[in-house]
Swiss-Prot record:
Positions that bind a divalent metal cation 1: H64, D102, E221
Assigned GO CC terms: cytoplasm
Family of the protein in this entry: Belongs to the GTP cyclohydrolase I type 2/NIF3 family.
Disulfide bonds: none
Pfam families in UniProt: DUF34_NIF3 (PF01784)
Keywords: Metal-binding
Top-level lineage group: Bacteria
Source species: Neisseria meningitidis serogroup A / serotype 4A (strain DSM 15465 / Z2491)
Extent of the signal sequence: none
Name the record gives this protein: GTP cyclohydrolase 1 type 2 homolog
Binding-site positions, a divalent metal cation 2: H65, H217, E221
GO molecular function: metal ion binding
Subunit structure: Homohexamer.
Length: 249
């Protein structure tokens, strides 16, 4: 068991949350019991994740996507009321870490994604160093790499580019980072991988020759929150359980 305060201090210091300009609060979002012995992780603080945390008798739900975002209505009604009420009813804490959890060099979503896909990280760049670039250990065709990504992430990616195109240098950023495609193009990489795609990326890929893969917002962000919880569990002797959803987005 660990005091909630000590656990949150460790997370904040590990992820260096004070260094980031974020559009979501990082840290405790819903307060529950004072001591933490069991953590449930989830990409998002969905009602399904909360119900699972209740079933597991968890003390903390640790997520990447919390329930509060800048520029949204500051009201607690409807689905948000139901989620928060369930947490409060069972005295469960909910903490979320957003951009700091994307960017951490070992525990973050980008680092964990690279480990699973076999990317060797050589550089962090772009806005708040949220993008990563590096080289494949062995060059692959775009088609072969897309098949590998599908196998690892268990989700069919959206691929823009010729399947036979050789891929050596890759840039990536988990989640909804399609807006950084031009930044990746400027790095001179062969491929940019992220979680989502918008209409404009199709044209940019075709007109610049830089391949683009959208591998799923949820799928590319499963692993950071798990790594953070498992690291904390080693430090504090906690029990950890992971929740996942079949989210196609």
């Amino acid at each position: 068991m660990v005091l909630r305060r000590d656990f949150l201090t460790w997370c904040n210091e590990t992820l260096q949350t004070a260094l980031f300009k974020d559009y979501a609060p990082n840290g405790l979002q819903v307060e529950g019991r004072e001591y933490i012995g069991k953590i449930v992780t989830s990409v998002t603080a969905s009602r399904a994740a909360i119900d699972f945390a209740v079933e597991q008798k968890a003390d903390l739900l640790l997520v990447h996507h919390g329930m509060f975002w800048k520029n949204e209505l500051p009201t607690v009604t409807g689905w948000k009321k139901e989620r928060i009420a369930a947490l409060l009813r069972h005295d469960i804490n909910m903490a979320g870490y957003h951009l700091p959890l994307d960017a951490h060099p070992t525990l973050g979503n980008n680092a964990q994604l690279a480990d699973r896909l076999g990317f060797a990280t050589e550089k962090r760049f772009g806005e708040q160093n949220l993008l990563n670039s590096g080289s494949l250990k062995q060059a692959k065709t775009l088609g072969a790499l897309a098949a590998h990504i599908e196998t690892v992430l268990q989700r069919k990616p959206v691929v823009i580019g010729k399947p036979e195109r050789e891929i050596r240098r890759v840039a990536w950023c988990s989640g909804g980072a399609q807006g950084f495609f031009q930044t990746a193009i400027d790095e001179g990489v062969d491929l940019y991988l992220t979680g989502e795609i918008s209409e404009a990326q199709y044209h940019l890929a075709n007109e610049t020759g830089t391949a683009f893969i959208s591998a799923g917002h949820h799928a590319t962000e499963r692993y950071g929150v798990r790594a953070l919880a498992e690291s904390a569990a080693e430090v504090f002797g906690l029990e950890v359980c992971h929740f996942d959803e079949n989210n196609p987005a």
